[in-house]
Amino acid sequence: MVDHLANTEINSQRIAAVENCFGASGQPLALPGRVLLGEGVLTKECRKKAKPRIFFLFNDILVYGSIVLSKRKYRSQHIIPLEEVTLEPLPETLQAKNRWMIKTAKKSFVVSAASTTERQEWISHIEECVRRQLLATGRQPTTEHAAPWIPDKATDICMRCTQTRFSALTRRHHCRKCGFVVCAECSRERFLLPRLSPKPLRVCSLCYRELAAQKRREEAKERFRGSPGQLTHLGSTMCGASSGDDDDSDEDREGSGDGDWPTQVEFYASGVSWSAFHS
């Protein structure tokens, strides 16, 4: 699937075309041995709503971005190393079909394809690439994954206190640990989550208590072992309450300018396959 395409002219041309579409805002993608295996449009469930995104499957990375002009211009490039990826198929419902979750240690999100066949093609190709990449690097599959953010529209009230009702004046926030939609009062705390960011992140009150308790247990074990020099003080990871706002709107900025795209139903109404895999 990979070897006969590596270092070929057609593969170089395909990768160069992807780089050109992202332009100066994207990172260089051409590397010795890297192969572009597939590409297509999937619907990504973002914080505000589901939006079409362009995806490119390479033998070692998964790349996706926002669509400005189909097959000509993309932006907001994201690169995910495949050895960090785990897939989770999601059950079908009347409102949501052909969905699966892409899980990594830093970010997890839900995507859907135009058809069951296309969904299965994406899943099988990604899983095969992940298997080969883990074999090549000798790494073990990732067992800890970031929680996917629950979409804003899923609830009108805080999912922790169940009392605060969201409005134009009372905004939603997301706990970076559990992904719940919470109010400002229920997410005043910050905690260092090294897998997600070098800076302390917003967490809900429940996750904060659990994380703080876990940290205290870890420090108690270190003290019991008699290794005070190796202690990481609780204060370095627990940052307490903060009235300042953090970045809750990556997807909103990423998706700005998508207003010209049709809704999810219209986008897939033609029944045309929006993905292609190279062999």
UniProtKB/Swiss-Prot annotation:
PANTHER family: PLECKSTRIN HOMOLOGY DOMAIN-CONTAINING FAMILY F MEMBER 1, PLECKSTRIN HOMOLOGY DOMAIN-CONTAINING FAMILY F MEMBER 2-RELATED
Zinc fingers classed as FYVE-type: ranges: 152-212
InterPro entries in the cross-refs: PH-like_dom_sf, PH_domain, PH_domain-containing_F, PH_Phafin, PKHF1_FYVE, Znf_FYVE, Znf_FYVE-rel, Znf_FYVE_PHD
Protein name (record): Pleckstrin homology domain-containing family F member 1
A Pfam entry, by short name: PH
PROSITE patterns: PH_DOMAIN, ZF_FYVE
Cellular localisation: Nucleus; Cytoplasm, Perinuclear region; Lysosome
Binding site for Zn(2+) 1: C158, C161, C183, C186
Note on domains (UniProt): PH and FYVE-type zinc finger domains are required for lysosomal location.
Biased composition (Acidic residues): 244-253
Highest taxon, organism lineage: Eukaryota
Residue positions binding Zn(2+) 2: C175, C178, C204, C207
The keyword RNA-binding appears for this protein: no
Function: May induce apoptosis through the lysosomal-mitochondrial pathway. Translocates to the lysosome initiating the permeabilization of lysosomal membrane (LMP) and resulting in the release of CTSD and CTSL to the cytoplasm. Triggers the caspase-independent apoptosis by altering mitochondrial membrane permeabilization (MMP) resulting in the release of PDCD8.
Coiled-coil positions: none
GO cellular component, one term: early endosome
Keywords attached to this entry: Apoptosis, Cytoplasm, Lysosome, Metal-binding, Nucleus, Zinc, Zinc-finger
GO MF: phosphatidylinositol binding; phosphatidylinositol-3-phosphate binding; phosphatidylinositol-4-phosphate binding; phosphatidylinositol-5-phosphate binding; zinc ion binding
Keyword presence, Metal-binding: yes
Main location: nucleus
GO-annotated biological processes: apoptotic process; endosome organization; endosome to lysosome transport; positive regulation of autophagy; protein localization to plasma membrane; vesicle organization
Stretches the record annotates as Disordered: 219-264
